[in-house]
Design a protein with these regions (language model features):
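A short, basic/flexible loop-to-alpha-helix module at the beginning of a structural domain
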Residues: 13-30, 129
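Non-heme iron-sulfur electron-transfer modules
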Residues: 22-24, 61-87, 101-104, 110-141, ...
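N-terminal Rossmann-like FAD-binding beta1-loop-alpha1 element of flavoenzymes
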Residues: 32-57
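A structural motif corresponding to the C-terminal end of an alpha-helix
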Residues: 91-99
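Acidic-histidine catalytic/liganding microenvironments
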Residues: 95-96, 146, 193
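Central beta-strand plus flanking loop segment that forms part of the substrate or channel wall
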Residues: 245-258
Length: 266
C-alpha cells in the first residue's frame, strides 16, 4: 500500500541521518560503599577490599553480623552460625581497605555514575572508641568492652537481639561476639545518672553529651545489602501471636534453641 511505501521511505531517510553511537567514558572513583553489614554485605566488602578497592561498610545497628548472628544453626551442614560468622567479622574488622562504620545511616546520595557523594549520619553512640579517645587527647582511653558501665547502670530494657526475651541495660552490647566491641548508650532510656561515667574511670570513654555527626564520602559504586525484617505478625490476629504463649515467631524460636540464647538452648 502507499502507506507502507511511505513508512519504508521514512525509515530509509531517517537511517541516512543516523550518527554513530560513541561510548563515553567518565573517571570512576576507586572506592565503594556497602550498605548493610550482614553476611552478604560483609562478603561483598571483603571481595571489594581484597581487589584493592577502598570500601566503606555502613551498618545502622551498633554491630556487624546482621540477622545471621541471631540464628542457631545453618543449612545444610548444621554448623553454628556464629562459628561461620565470627571469623568473617574479624576479617572485616582487620582488613586495611575496609572502613567499618557501625551505628551509621545513609542520609543523602548525590552525584552520577562512577562519582557519588554520600552523606552519612553517624549516630551518637555515647561511647568513644580508642581511636576517638586518642584523637581527643585521652591517652590510653576509649572503650575496651570491659562492661563495668553496664554493671552499674540502673535502667533495664528488653534486648532486641534476644527478641525481647532477655534484658539489657541502657548502656549495652547486643551479645559477647559483637564487632566492634564497643558499648552503646540508648539515649531514649538513659537517665543520665552518670554512674557509668564514674565506673569507666580513667578510660573516659563515655560522653553523654555526644551528638550525631554528618560525614561525606566519595565513592564510585554502592551495593545495597540491607537484609530483611520480619513482617508485623501482630497484625495477623488469626495466628494468635501474643495471644497464646505457644505461638512464637521464627526468630524467637531461633533464640530459644540457641545455646547462647536467653534460655541456653532449652
Amino acid at each position: 500500500t502507499e502507506k507502507a511505501k511511505d513508512q519504508v521511505r521514512m525509515a530509509v531517510a531517517k537511517a541516512a541521518k543516523l550518527e554513530d553511537l560513541i561510548p563515553k567514558s567518565v573517571p570512576v572513583e576507586r572506592a565503594a560503599m556497602v550498605v548493610g553489614a550482614g553476611v552478604g554485605g560483609m562478603q561483598a566488602a571483603l571481595d571489594l577490599a581484597s581487589a584493592g578497592i577502598k570500601t566503606y561498610l555502613i551498618e545502622a545497628t551498633p554491630t556487624i553480623g546482621g540477622r545471621m548472628s541471631q540464628l542457631d544453626k545453618t543449612f545444610p551442614t548444621l554448623d553454628c552460625s556464629q562459628c561461620i560468622l565470627t571469623p568473617k567479622m574479624v576479617d572485616v574488622g582487620r582488613h586495611p581497605n575496609i572502613e567499618m562504620m557501625t551505628y551509621t545511616e545513609v542520609e543523602k546520595v548525590e552525584g552520577y555514575i562512577g562519582n557519588f557523594d554520600i552523606t552519612l549520619r553517624k549516630k551518637a553512640r555515647g561511647v568513644l572508641t580508642p581511636d576517638e579517645a586518642t584523637a581527643k587527647g585521652i591517652v590510653g582511653g576509649g572503650c575496651n568492652g570491659c562492661g563495668d558501665c553496664a554493671e552499674v547502670c540502673p535502667v533495664i530494657k528488653p534486648n532486641p537481639f534476644e527478641m525481647g526475651m532477655a534484658p539489657r541495660k541502657a548502656i549495652y552490647i547486643y551479645h559477647a561476639q559483637v564487632m566492634p566491641l564497643i558499648y552503646t548508650v540508648d539515649f531514649d532510656s538513659c537517665v543520665k545518672c552518670n554512674l557509668c561515667v564514674d565506673a569507666c574511670g580513667d578510660k573516659k570513654a563515655i560522653d553523654l553529651e555526644m551528638q550525631d555527626e554528618f560525614i561525606t564520602v566519595k565513592v564510585g559504586t554502592a551495593i545495597l545489602a540491607t537484609g530483611f525484617d520480619l513482617i508485623p505478625i501482630e497484625g495477623k490476629r488469626e495466628w494468635g501471636y501474643k495471644q497464646f504463649d505457644n505461638v512464637i515467631s521464627s526468630l524467637e524460636f531461633e533464640r530459644l534453641i540457641c545455646a547462647s540464647g536467653p534460655t541456653g538452648g532449652h
